[in-house]
Amino acid sequence: MARSLKKNPFVANHSLRKIKNLNIKEEKKIIVTWSRASVIVPAMIGHTIAVHNGREHLPIYVTDRMVDHKLGEFAPTLLFQGHARNDKKSRR
């Protein structure tokens, strides 16, 4: 179920505060975050945000097409190794 339009989108306060400070100073630094549930807002455009995927932080450059998506959508947590070949040993 989608979030109510009466409410504002969820953005972690510490991330938003860091981005606003960087926008005021006009700096471009990598912002490290564990908040995968945060929604990308227009203030984040042009910044690089390192999102945690459970093992490491993946740097993601935010563009205008990413607005209203969540940060976790761009940092996959599972690594697909591929299907097993026809292995005669594993079958009975």
Swiss-Prot record:
Primary localisation category: plastid
Pfam family, one: Ribosomal_S19
Any one biological process term the GO annotation gives: translation
Family annotation (Gene3D superfamilies): 30s Ribosomal Protein S19, Chain A (3.30.860.10)
InterPro entries, sorted: Ribosomal_uS19, Ribosomal_uS19_bac-type, Ribosomal_uS19_CS, Ribosomal_uS19_SF
GO cellular component assignments: chloroplast; mitochondrial small ribosomal subunit
PROSITE patterns: RIBOSOMAL_S19
Gene Ontology MF, one: structural constituent of ribosome
Compartment(s) of residence: Plastid, Chloroplast
Keywords: Chloroplast, Plastid, Ribonucleoprotein, Ribosomal protein, RNA-binding, rRNA-binding
Family per similarity comment: Belongs to the universal ribosomal protein uS19 family.
HAMAP family: Ribosomal_uS19
Reported function: Protein S19 forms a complex with S13 that binds strongly to the 16S ribosomal RNA.
Name recorded for this polypeptide: Small ribosomal subunit protein uS19c
Gene that this sequence comes from: rps19
